[in-house]
Amino acid sequence: MANYDVLKVDGTKAGSIELNDNVFGIEPNQHVLFEAINLQRASMRQGTHAVKNRSAVSGGGRKPWKQKGTGRARQGTIRAPQWRGGGIVFGPTPRSYSYKMPKKMRRLALRSALSAKVQENAFTVLESLTFDAPKTKEFKNMTTTLELPKKVLFVVEAEDVNVALSARNIPGVTVITTTGLNVLDIVHANQVVMTKGAVEKVEEVLG
């Protein structure tokens, strides 16, 4: 287990914590990370695309000309696919793009993403993160004091309305709870900041 500094919101050291190597110290599995990101992105798709086939296009109920005697090719409707304004063949229909991944793979992906951030020195542990009231300015000052990059993911152990409201209007800052921890947010962030309580909760689940 590796020792990691625990910081206060003013940047001073509050102590240290031993990170579980099974969660924060494994060799990142790039393939599983790739699969987990694909799964998340697929689940985000709306899937509301739709086109009209020959039965859905308005009109075309009358046969355009008689079957025989005209010398022309036989036609049953002006909404057949070969006609201008006709229906679409095998077009997209509304569907869900989401699919499932085994639980062990999902957890391995989370451990891989967290371990990668630790290896990149893009991981910070805070003693706690609380506000008496929504204070965007204080939150912004904290990110400056801690010298955090533009894209930061804050992970807290439980939902805190004041923290969420304080960070909501700051570009590039995302606040989630441990239950909402996901690979896409971790990978997209330049820095992951977790509270000590959040680290303990994550280790309890993934360790």
Curated annotation (Swiss-Prot):
Coiled coil: none
Biological-process GO terms, alphabetical: translation
Record family assignment: Belongs to the universal ribosomal protein uL4 family.
Function: One of the primary rRNA binding proteins, this protein initially binds near the 5'-end of the 23S rRNA. It is important during the early stages of 50S assembly. It makes multiple contacts with different domains of the 23S rRNA in the assembled 50S subunit and ribosome.
SUPFAM superfamilies, sorted: Ribosomal protein L4
Name this protein carries in UniProt: Large ribosomal subunit protein uL4
Gene Ontology MF annotations: rRNA binding; structural constituent of ribosome
Span list, region Disordered: 50-76
Domain of life assignment: Bacteria
Record-linked Gene3D superfamilies: 3.40.1370.10
